[in-house]
Amino acid sequence: MRVTAHEISLTQRHVWRSAREAIPVQRALVVEVEQDGVTGFGEASAFMTAHYNSGVDQLHADLRRIAPLLADLGPDDPFAVWRRLFAALPDSPFVLAALDTAVHDLRARLLGVPLWRALALDSPQELRSSFSIGLDETEMMVHKLCERPGWAAYKVKLADPGDLTVLEELRRHTSAPFYVDGNCGWTLSRLLPVLPALQDLGVQLIEQPFPRSAWWDTRTLKQHSPIPVIADESITSMQDFAACAEAFDGINV
């Protein structure tokens, strides 16, 4: 298989803000894996570059390093390909994900079937997704929601869980469930007292409220929260799985 990468820059409609950072432009690589004139596609995003070892230069370097290995492999068994790639690039999860996706896509295209069928899965039915609203002034966050009506759920970035103004204003414009995301920026003392109010406002999921190192706080929250608590930044590999299983109700994949 032959690999090619195309660097892209995606300008956000609105500057993407969370409790951790602001991103006006998202850089990424579109990764192609080709065999016999057929191409599969994947994507590697330069996101949280220090945390995930995912700077664009590093992504390019890892792809160049793995290209000779791919040249000797075929797409007939994507799971075997992934094991070979992981052994060679254990510290490059975004490149691994892009190549894994592309190889699965390539195999399905070579077979002439949808990906779900190539994986021997049932046909997808009634897939649901949420629309994410980045951190901003309250009026702008309401504007972002009103630009995208009708979603099954809205994930809302919040700087402070104790400030319910944003959720109260958003609730005036939709009956859809809310997911709230702290992006590692909250504290247990601010979150615990407002759990009943968050539940009353239709919050169905709390994502990564505390820093990655705050395992005790997260375990305590899980014990007391009527709302499921989901890991994001706390899991970067299977080595984090046991700790996350104890501290969280689920994982954002």
Regions found by a protein language model. Give the residues of each.
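Short, Gly/Pro- and small/polar-rich lid/capping loops
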Residues: 1-27
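Metal- or metallocofactor-binding catalytic centers and their adjacent structured scaffolds
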Residues: 5, 33-34, 39-110
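Conserved, mostly hydrophobic/aromatic
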Residues: 31, 37, 99, 112, ...
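Residue-level marker for buried hydrophobic side chains located in beta-strands
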Residues: 40, 178-180, 229-230, 251
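Acidic active-site catalytic centers that drive phospho-/nucleotidyl reactions
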Residues: 43, 100, 105, 181, ...
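Metal-dependent enolase-superfamily TIM-barrel catalytic cores that perform enediolate-based chemistry
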Residues: 115-225
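Catalytic alpha/beta core domains of metabolic enzymes, predominantly
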Residues: 213-253
